[in-house]
A protein has these predicted regions:
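Active-site histidine-anchored catalytic micro-motif
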Residues: 1-260
Length: 260
């Protein structure tokens, strides 16, 4: 917050690769207003070790800053990516993905976000430092899930549930209420804890179970990666400058992939 951007051509933040996607999403949303390039970079291996891409990522960031082509926050790891769409690296080849990117049909990894859109001035929303005292419970869906295993504590401000790609989940109570997401949602709401469901698509017919999940009181987060949704919730519930609902309703820095 204390950086006078008029004094610099750009900023390079070196970061560990394990949590690169998470920090990238958070900084992209918080520093959405940056009028100079902020590149977040990492390395797959220690600098100097054979096969390390760290020096390439660093020199690429320096070169792009000198070009003056980009304005705003970006992640640079072998390619330039929107920070709010970076998917954590796989555990096999340490390669990061881009949420919503269709390699066959997308000319750019920015997926529908033009350079003109990126260059437009953006309103500064967050002015104060944020202390992350409130927690968000992050649950990823899988078969035979028992929601009785999840007990939000007093520091839990919200729950994020990341479902299958069709956004479906078990709502059947015949085998027991603890297996139904709808019952878990109701249990959380009685404790004044809201449950958010990420990855839903706008203007797409939904399955009956998805309708039940929303009817139970959950809040949808549309076409946003689980990583970006999680960090957005952490930011929304811990900042004190605007209502949570207003933060969650804004597309802060292209985290929502919008289809034409």
């Amino acid at each position: 917050n204390s950086i006078d951007t008029a004094l610099y051509s750009g900023v390079i933040l070196t970061h560990g690769s394990d949590t690169l996607a998470y920090t990238s999403a958070l900084l992209g949303m918080y520093f959405r207003h940056f009028d100079i390039p902020l590149f977040i970079i990492a390395s797959n291996k220690p600098i100097g070790e054979k096969g390390s891409n760290g020096l390439f990522n660093f020199t690429s960031a320096v070169g792009l800053i000198k070009e003056g082509k980009y304005k705003g926050v970006f992640t640079l790891y072998e390619r330039v990516m929107l920070p709010t769409r970076v998917i954590p690296a796989d555990t096999c080849r340490d390669r990061f993905g881009v949420y919503g990117y269709d390699g066959f049909n997308d000319f750019s990894v920015f997926s529908g976000v033009s350079e003109n859109m990126l260059s437009r001035p953006r309103e500064r929303i967050f002015h104060n430092d944020v202390k992350f005292g409130k927690r968000v419970l992050f649950i990823e869906g899988y078969p035979a899930m028992d929601f009785g295993c999840f007990v939000p504590n007093e520091d839990t401000a919200a729950v994020l549930y990341s479902p299958y790609h069709s956004a479906t989940a078990c709502t059947d109570v015949s085998e027991g209420k603890s297996y139904a997401l709808t019952e878990f949602i109701k249990r959380c709401i009685t404790k004044n804890i809201m449950v958010y469901i990420c990855g839903l698509k706008r203007k797409v017919p939904i399955y009956s179970t998805v309708a039940e999940i929303i009817k139970a009181g959950s809040i949808p987060i549309y076409t946003t990666s689980a990583v970006a949704a999680y960090m957005k919730l952490l930011l929304a519930y811990n900042q004190e400058e605007m209502p949570v609902k207003e933060v969650m309703g804004k597309d802060l820095f292209f985290e929502e992939v919008k289809f034409s």
